[in-house]
Swiss-Prot record:
UniProt name for this protein: Anti-sigma F factor
Gene source species: Lysinibacillus sphaericus (Bacillus sphaericus)
Function: Binds to sigma F and blocks its ability to form an RNA polymerase holoenzyme (E-sigma F). Phosphorylates SpoIIAA on a serine residue. This phosphorylation may enable SpoIIAA to act as an anti-anti-sigma factor that counteracts SpoIIAB and thus releases sigma F from inhibition.
GO biological process terms held by the UniProt record: asexual sporulation; negative regulation of sporulation resulting in formation of a cellular spore; sporulation resulting in formation of a cellular spore
Keyword annotations of the record: ATP-binding, Kinase, Nucleotide-binding, Serine/threonine-protein kinase, Sporulation, Transferase
Molecular-function annotations in GO: ATP binding; protein serine kinase activity; protein serine/threonine kinase activity; sigma factor antagonist activity
Gene: spoIIAB
Pfam families xrefs: HATPase_c_2
Length: 146
């Protein structure tokens, strides 16, 4: 393992930016392209937002943990909460499915995460919590300094 980090915070909407910045800083060690950075930042944002919005019935009544691990040029991030969980993971991963339509949620979070990562895994137990894990290999080309 080359490096890893863990960040735990209250399930508050404003902490989504904290998680996004922390993970973006963590992967900056790989010298990613702007596109790679932007896509990965979007995946982190979607996963953390889902954990905050869908994981707990009240803001700040639980915690979200983000764990990132880098091995060579592959980064794996897990976003975990011990809140409500997902009753039907297959249904939740369908495009446009949302349990929060009154909040104008688009239901595209898992679709976006899946399209911007190399691998996406969702493990959930109803009323026990959810772990969303995504992996991305970075293909940056470094030039030698002479």
């Amino acid at each position: 393992m080359d490096n890893e980090m863990t960040l735990t915070f209250l399930a508050l909407s404003e902490n989504e930016a904290l998680a996004r910045v922390a993970v973006t800083g963590f992967i900056a060690q790989l010298d990613p392209t702007i596109d790679e950075l932007s896509e990965f930042k979007t995946v982190v944002s979607e996963a953390v937002s889902n954990a905050i919005i869908h994981g707990y019935e009240e803001d700040g009544k639980g915690v979200v943990t983000v764990h990132a691990k880098r091995e060579d040029d592959v980064v794996t991030v897990s976003v975990m909460h011990k809140g409500i969980g997902i009753e039907d993971v297959s249904q939740a991963m369908e495009p446009l499915f949302t349990t929060k339509s009154v909040m104008e949620r688009s239901g595209m979070g898992f679709t976006i995460m899946d399209s911007f990562s190399d691998q996406l895994t969702v493990m959930s137990k109803w009323r026990e919590g959810t772990t969303v894990t995504f992996t991305k290999k970075f293909y940056t080309v470094r030039t030698a300094v002479m």
